[in-house]
Amino acid sequence: MTPLETKRPLQLNDQGQLQHFLSLDGLRRELLTEILDTADSFLEVGARAVKKVPLLRGKTVCNVFFENSTRTRTTFELAAQRLSADVITLNVSTSSASKGETLLDTLRNLEAMAADMFVVRHGDSGAAHFIAEHVCPQVAIINGGDGRHAHPTQGMLDMLTIRRHKGSFENLSVAIVGDILHSRVARSNMLALKTLGCPDIRVIAPKTLLPIGVEQYGVKVYTDMTEGLKDVDVVIMLRLQRERMTGGLLPSEGEFYRLFGLTTARLAGAKPDAIVMHPGPINRGVEIESAVADGPHSVILNQVTYGIAIRMAVLSMAMSGQTAQRQFDQENAQ
């Protein structure tokens, strides 16, 4: 598995500001920290009686989801609305795409309607990069998840969750458990943790669900839950992505749970104050026990709350960077 290389100008404008948010690969620690700090400031907005700020007033954000995701779509909608943007959500299953219109056609038609930003979720790895580079370079593109490649806002909301509960990344042990092979969340989390200075990143999975070359992300690989969870501070569970699996990668879900399910007994091997995370949707009794998902170590619902703040931060920063780049281009064209 090789992380997709991201050219600096594609995600960042000439001033080094975010103008698209496609992947965490290649982004500096300072920029990730700025996103986290900005999201922290937006958490206060969610606690107000009137949950709005005027940063994107007059702007139009289009959510274009070619894959279903209630949680991600809803939090992007809320984030844009809290920034005072006009929001359009395209239900692809009932749109022209179901009648044969391509991704390219759909986005160019939306661009012609003067949209300022697209949040795109697509089943093909690299779709967001393609759109930003070749289809709509003058529109801010946010990757809402593309194939197995990346889910950068999920990665950042997970980092915000960890930072708010643990303070910093400097002395942490973090275990990512489950279907690493098919998980764009795992890839984004590994990149973010490494960039933010986490010294002990572990992946725990059966060999059939580990990508070739995963060690290049700076992780330690475990195929035994008891060994992998020993004294960790954070446990990030992943669901089995049956829809992306081909062939007999697993004997059964029951066998997976027996060997890799997070139970109360297994969690006892982690640190006493360990937190348990999950990007959702949760498959209870497959990757996690209900007593753990609903227990005192779980911060799963906090992740949803923090997700709105992270997406507010990314939307506002990318829109600002895209606007600054347009002004820069206009000034230099004169």
From Swiss-Prot:
GO biological process terms, semicolon-separated: 'de novo' pyrimidine nucleobase biosynthetic process; 'de novo' UMP biosynthetic process; amino acid metabolic process
Record keywords, A-Z: Pyrimidine biosynthesis, Transferase
InterPro entries, per the entry: Asp/Orn_carbamoyltranf_P-bd, Asp/Orn_carbamoylTrfase, Asp/Orn_carbamoylTrfase_sf, Asp_carbamoyltransf, Asp_carbamoyltransf_Asp/Orn-bd
Gene3D superfamilies to which the protein is assigned, alphabetical: Aspartate/ornithine carbamoyltransferase
Recorded GO MF terms: amino acid binding; aspartate carbamoyltransferase activity
EC number(s) on file: 2.1.3.2
Binding positions for carbamoyl phosphate per the UniProt entry: R71, T72, R121, H151, Q154, G280, P281
Catalytic activity: carbamoyl phosphate + L-aspartate = N-carbamoyl-L-aspartate + phosphate + H(+)
Cellular component terms per the entry's GO annotation: cytosol
Protein's UniProt keywords contain 4Fe-4S: no
Binding-site positions, L-aspartate: K99, R184, R239
Pathway info: Pyrimidine metabolism; UMP biosynthesis via de novo pathway; (S)-dihydroorotate from bicarbonate: step 2/3
Pfam families, per the entry: OTCace, OTCace_N
Top-level taxon of origin: Bacteria
Protein role: Catalyzes the condensation of carbamoyl phosphate and aspartate to form carbamoyl aspartate and inorganic phosphate, the committed step in the de novo pyrimidine nucleotide biosynthesis pathway.
Entry's family note: Belongs to the aspartate/ornithine carbamoyltransferase superfamily. ATCase family.
Alphabetized NCBIfam families for the sequence: asp_carb_tr, PRK00856.1
Matching PANTHER family: ASPARTATE CARBAMOYLTRANSFERASE, ORNITHINE CARBAMOYLTRANSFERASE, MITOCHONDRIAL
Quaternary state and interactors: Heterododecamer (2C3:3R2) of six catalytic PyrB chains organized as two trimers (C3), and six regulatory PyrI chains organized as three dimers (R2).
Protein name: Aspartate carbamoyltransferase catalytic subunit
Lineage: Bacteria, Pseudomonadati, Pseudomonadota, Gammaproteobacteria, Pseudomonadales
Gene: pyrB
